């Protein structure tokens, strides 16, 4: 279970990520030029795509889900499952340093927001109602992900 939800811990994690990998820092204008309007709204303004509308919701191919903004690996198809919530769901990130956790008190709720550790892009939220494997449900906007299919010899 994650316990990484305070701003102080998040700042420390960003510092740790900086030491281990290249953090992507861009101006607001650069993000606007790179991303579509919907990608910008979700990834940079913490928006949410409508449920059951995402292109990756029903994807069952084997591969890796990466950040739309910086292409950092975030989730594996091995961890994807159908939670019925209307957004792609995973029981864990691809590794412990792929995502950041941040308390989110918006809309009168207490949730835990997840962001890309490399570029600080909004991905979605994590909830403690996932499958028995981890008990967590990483609920992610499709628009915040790109899918890299693993080619098989089948």
Swiss-Prot record:
Enzyme class: oxidoreductase
UniProt-annotated catalytic positions: 139
Record keyword Oxidoreductase present: yes
Domain MsrB: 28-150
Binding, Zn(2+): 67, 70, 116, 119
A GO molecular-function descriptor: peptide-methionine (R)-S-oxide reductase activity
GO cellular component labels: cytoplasm
Similarity comment: Belongs to the MsrB Met sulfoxide reductase family.
Protein name: Peptide methionine sulfoxide reductase MsrB
Organism: Vibrio vulnificus (strain CMCP6)
Lineage: Bacteria, Pseudomonadati, Pseudomonadota, Gammaproteobacteria, Vibrionales
Gene name linked to the record: msrB
